[in-house]
């Protein structure tokens, strides 16, 4: 495949969805609209809006949101004129009924997310999204937990259900640059040339931007990123950093770097009640290959039971826990307590 540095990259912002994890899903309507206005002014292509765990994620298991998904989506729809509104749906958490409500509220893109080996459960949701006329994306989470070849097979399933773009999703921030390269080559070898691909990176090993650059070199079309890296764990690829790097590389990203830089520092960073950065705990996520949104839950359990957050995270990684198993964090903490 010949890399085309002149093609327009699709910039997909996730500050208002993945970024929700960083503040325990407590964005106010005022916060959401201020961030959306800045992103729209900077000309990003899409803005993802939802609870951190997707439509209907607000729950005891994942954490209750300050507002409903529909309230957030409607608030963003009021202020954007350029960017399209995206949302996230995890089969088993959100249903096709919730997807229809999100569409009616203003969402026009949906990313249907499954564990990297469970694409089968996305069939109904992808098909229904296509019926609604939505830009329908398959989102293969925790992509480090299977081989490039197996990931490609799962990507092909999502394509066969109707997804027109498939994402390699590094939910644990555990992929190396070579890992990303191998996965994109395998996936693109199996998908139709007309099917787009996307990268969703996390920064737990400080490779979020580097991995996104490698993905683009391998033909990736859509890049997820967030202002100030606002996201689960050590955050996502920081949007303003990726755009600055893309600018230096001469790539066509279509966004305004300075508007993004200002929004990151003046609007988003002040909202963080825990710094979104690589530190002892978030590094443990990437090192152990643990779902990034486990961080805040593990910190609560560690404080409650007098344990080390790192020990809890490493044990979760050893047990190969995946997204949706947040309830196991307390189980692991109690097991560690018993051993100590």
Swiss-Prot record:
It catalyses: (S)-4-hydroxy-2-oxopentanoate = acetaldehyde + pyruvate. Pfam families: DmpG_comm, HMGL-like. SUPFAM superfamilies: Aldolase, post-HMGL domain-like. Gene3D superfamilies: 1.10.8.60, Aldolase class I. It comes from the Bacteria. The record marks 17 as: Transition state stabilizer. Its EC number is 4.1.3.39. Residues 9-261 form the Pyruvate carboxyltransferase domain. Substrate binds at residues 17-18, 171, 200, 291. Coiled coil: none annotated. CDD domains: DRE_TIM_HOA (cd07943). The keyword Metal-binding applies. GO terms for biological process: catabolic process; L-leucine biosynthetic process. InterPro entries: 2-IPM_HCS-like, 4OH_2_O-val_aldolase, Aldolase_TIM, DmpG_comm, DRE_TIM_HOA, PYR_CT. Keywords: Aromatic hydrocarbons catabolism, Lyase, Manganese, Metal-binding. The active site is at 21 (proton acceptor). Mn(2+) binds at residues 18, 200, 202. One of its GO terms (molecular function) is 4-hydroxy-2-oxovalerate aldolase activity. Belongs to the 4-hydroxy-2-oxovalerate aldolase family. This is 4-hydroxy-2-oxovalerate aldolase 4. It comes from Azotobacter vinelandii (strain DJ / ATCC BAA-1303). The lineage of its organism: Bacteria, Pseudomonadati, Pseudomonadota, Gammaproteobacteria, Pseudomonadales.
């Amino acid at each position: 495949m010949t890399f085309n540095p002149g093609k327009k990259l699709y910039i997909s912002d996730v500050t208002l969805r993945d970024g929700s994890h960083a503040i325990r899903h407590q964005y106010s309507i005022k916060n959401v609209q201020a961030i959306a206005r800045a992103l729209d002014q900077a000309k990003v292509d899409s803005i993802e809006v939802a609870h951190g765990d997707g439509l209907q994620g607000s729950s005891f298991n994942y954490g209750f949101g300050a507002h409903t998904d529909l309230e957030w989506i409607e608030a963003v729809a009021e202020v954007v004129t350029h960017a399209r509104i995206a949302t996230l749906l995890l089969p088993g958490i959100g249903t096709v009924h919730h997807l229809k409500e999100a569409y009616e509220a203003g969402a026009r893109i949906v990313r249907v997310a499954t564990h990297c080996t469970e694409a089968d459960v996305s069939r109904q949701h992808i098909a229904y999204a296509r019926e609604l006329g939505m830009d329908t994306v398959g989102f293969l989470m925790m992509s480090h937990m299977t081989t490039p070849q197996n990931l490609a097979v799962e990507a092909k399933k999502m394509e066969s259900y109707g997804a027109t773009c498939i994402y390699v999703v590094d939910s644990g921030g555990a992929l190396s640059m070579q890992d990303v390269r191998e996965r994109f080559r395998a996936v693109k070898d199996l998908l139709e040339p007309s099917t787009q691909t996307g990268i969703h990176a996390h920064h737990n090993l400080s490779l979020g931007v580097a991995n996104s650059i490698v993905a683009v070199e391998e033909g990736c079309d859509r890049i997820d990123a967030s202002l100030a890296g606002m996201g689960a764990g050590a955050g996502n690829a920081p949007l303003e950093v990726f755009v600055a790097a893309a600018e230096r590389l001469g790539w066509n990203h279509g966004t305004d770097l300075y508007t993004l830089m200002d929004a990151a520092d003046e609007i988003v960073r002040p909202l963080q009640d825990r710094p979104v950065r690589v530190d002892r705990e978030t590094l443990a996520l990437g090192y152990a290959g643990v779902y990034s949104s486990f961080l805040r839950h593990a910190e609560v359990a560690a404080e409650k039971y007098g344990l080390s957050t790192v020990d809890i995270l490493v044990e979760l990684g050893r047990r190969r826990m995946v997204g949706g198993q947040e309830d196991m964090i307390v189980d692991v903490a109690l097991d560690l307590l018993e051993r100590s």
